[in-house]
């Protein structure tokens, strides 16, 4: 499992931006496509909100990839 550290003073990152920053997708359009196709899970549940706020402690999963926000 990867760890993703939020920036100092940042409370959250949007789901589509996180999976793009982690390199799991190449573009924002692909991120939207993957979320719309119910391929992304947050804390074990399928997530369809593109702008879902990922906060410290949340675990995001895509295929065999997992990351925890710190």
Label the model's feature ranges:
Residues 1-11:
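A detector for short, charged/polar N-terminal pre-domain segments
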Residues 13-53:
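A basic, amphipathic helix-loop patch mediating RNA/tRNA/ribosome contacts
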Residues 66-70:
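Short, Lys/Arg- and Gly-enriched loop/turn segments at beta-strand edges
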């Amino acid at each position: 499992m990867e760890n993703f550290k939020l920036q100092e003073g940042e409370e959250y990152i949007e789901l589509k931006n996180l999976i793009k920053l982690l390199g799991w997708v190449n573009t924002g359009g692909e991120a939207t496509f993957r979320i719309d196709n119910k391929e992304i899970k947050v804390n074990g549940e399928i997530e369809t909100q593109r702008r879902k706020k990922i906060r410290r402690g949340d675990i995001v999963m895509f295929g065999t990839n997992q990351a925890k926000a710190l």
